[in-house]
Amino acid sequence: MNSTMLRVTNRIIERSRDTRAAYLARINQAKTDTVHRAQLACGNLAHGFAACQADDKASLKSMLRNNIAIITSYNDMLSAHQPYEHYPEIIRKALHSANAVGQVAGGVPAMCDGMERSLLIREVIAMSPAIGLSHNMFDGALYLGVCDKIVPGLTMAALSFGHLPSVFIPSGPMASGLPNKEKVRIRQLYAEGKVDRMALLESEAASYHAPGTCTFYGTANTNQMVVEFMGMQLPGSSFVHPDAPLREALTAAAARQVTRMTGNGNEWMPLGKMFDEKVVVNGIVALLATGGSTNHTMHLVAMARAAGIIINWDDFSDLSDVVPLLA
């Protein structure tokens, strides 16, 4: 390992010793030796699966099969989140094939352009999944989100339930549209009064034109890359288009993977344990190596702190001295 990277990593470990230990103690206290729903009163448990189909009810009554929470940020106004409309059904089918059950446990506010008070909204997003996950119905969670402050907020939420294994599922990038040079040309003509508003709108709509993340390497696409580097989503899953057959296959594979990571599986790995100081350094390296969004110099600090890990901008600065820009 590069000596600077090792020094920064060890510095973060030492700085975070007390807060990390307190965090790990908290999530260890929340861990159970059986499925979480076994602790519920019968009335509460019956309420939790009342709307399920018969075979899912039987599975949940048995106390033997995993129940996986689906936390979604689907809406129709945000192109990167519109593909999530049909993900729950894909996930449920994949979970059934793995002898598990999937339930949509709740949603989060998901907007991007024009969202005011960005960091406050990130905190609201971080708190929203707690409503669904706090019912103690679930043995793992899948998080559907990709844009700007939504992924950082979801990560903070997942870490607040760090005793559960969690996997993030991206939606993938929008296909390329109108080339940037042409878009810039039309914007310039509009500024000069040589084309009207409709021409400008047609240009913008031809550029930002389909489901998926924006066609530039902004915060949303940085989210996908950083989360992949941190081991929170499947390798190679970031940049597959929403309508590609591979995207559906990756979504199903992510659902099956989280079942293997539960206490009933053979690869038990709660997110809070996996998300350690080395994972955080991997995230910073991913950001620096890919020339990602500088918004993550704020978001990664908050994400790490949610796991009891303390990083600061000196860590970013020192790592930036030795991490080459690859793309």
Which residue ranges define each predicted feature?
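Metallocofactor- and cofactor-centric catalytic cores in central/energy metabolism, strongly enriched
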Residues: 1-327
